[in-house]
Amino acid sequence: MGVGRRSNIRAPAYMSSGPSYAQPVPAAYGSGMSQGTAASPFAGCVERPIRFVHRGRIAEVAGADTTRTLLDWLREDARCPGTKEGCAEGDCGACTVLVGERDAQAPGGVRFRNVNACIQLLPMLDGKALLTVEDLKPAAQACGAALHPAQQALVECHGSQCGFCTPGFVMSMVQVYERDRAAGTAPGRQQLADDLAGNLC
């Protein structure tokens, strides 16, 4: 199985502890969620339900095949087609989502990083949090905005062509925006190029 560049060499991303466009994952963790690791990928089916935070609540998936990808679950089971399948090898970035893990040192107590959903096995989400492109608008509206600033910038600057790769670019841009907003910094052109290197148009 191929290995995605971003999911292995990208520096950890941090979501802001202030008013954020991410769902309130720390609160959901407090309702019985653990930091447990997923079952072995060689076990056939996961013996206990997989639990992870999605859209501010704990999602539970029972009887999941250990070889099922997060992308397949999103598109086929959760009916969330916003996350696209491009290369299915972890190279094009069309399927980019953000996966969060508890981290007391991170703003808000959760550390998010970019992940290629096409090579992320579903059981690996156990005890974590998930943020997809379709989760951005409701969270933005809760903060009094129509879209996340990354989405709004793409609209205003005509940043899409056919649009198929756009959701992946958006999620990478969200990670950059939230990371730098929390740090009070602004990325330079070269930093942005590095951050978006895993997304192909």
Where are these regions (language model features)?
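Low-complexity, intrinsically disordered Ser/Thr/Pro- and acidic-rich segments
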Residues: 1-3
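Signature of N-terminal electron-transfer/Fe-S-associated modules in redox systems
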Residues: 5-201
